[in-house]
């Protein structure tokens, strides 16, 4: 088993979210919307429960990434886990959704491809939680 770096785990999460948005744009948007989280009664759509579980899986992957990175000393140790997870998810998905919705504008006004724009955004987010190394 190869040793994963914190940065490569992060890139894997970003790629997974991009792939999810490209393959299932409707569900990707749905994960970001307000959905029913009460599944005790039968007053919900099957898609809501599925979307909830996908969201929970994404939260868990981000949580493991943050915990591992903090443990290794790659990520800031002052991160509050649950708020960080939710903010992280919001920032990454916002970058992805914005790139999908505004691809033509990004190309025309910035001269960047959709992927270049997302990579830049992803690196800004990562740098905000990474430990600053002084050389």
Pin down the residues of each PLM region.
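Conserved acidic
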Residues: 2, 6-9, 50, 54, ...
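Hydrophobic alpha-helical transmembrane segments
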Residues: 2-3, 31, 62-66
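Alpha-helix C-capping/helix-to-loop hinge sites
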Residues: 3, 72-73
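Short beta-strand "wing" residues that participate in macromolecule-binding interfaces
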Residues: 77
């Amino acid at each position: 088993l190869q040793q994963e770096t914190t940065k490569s785990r992060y890139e894997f999460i970003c790629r997974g979210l991009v792939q999810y948005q490209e393959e299932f744009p409707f569900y990707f948007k749905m994960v970001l919307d307000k959905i029913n989280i009460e599944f005790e009664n039968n007053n919900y759509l099957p898609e809501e429960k599925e979307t909830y579980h996908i969201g929970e899986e994404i939260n868990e992957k981000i949580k493991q990434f943050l915990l591992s990175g903090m443990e290794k000393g790659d990520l800031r140790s002052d991160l509050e886990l649950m708020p960080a997870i939710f903010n992280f998810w919001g920032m990454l998905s916002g970058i992805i959704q914005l790139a999908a919705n505004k691809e033509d504008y990004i190309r025309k006004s910035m001269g960047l491809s959709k992927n270049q724009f997302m990579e830049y955004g992803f690196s800004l987010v990562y740098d905000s939680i990474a430990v600053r190394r002084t050389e």
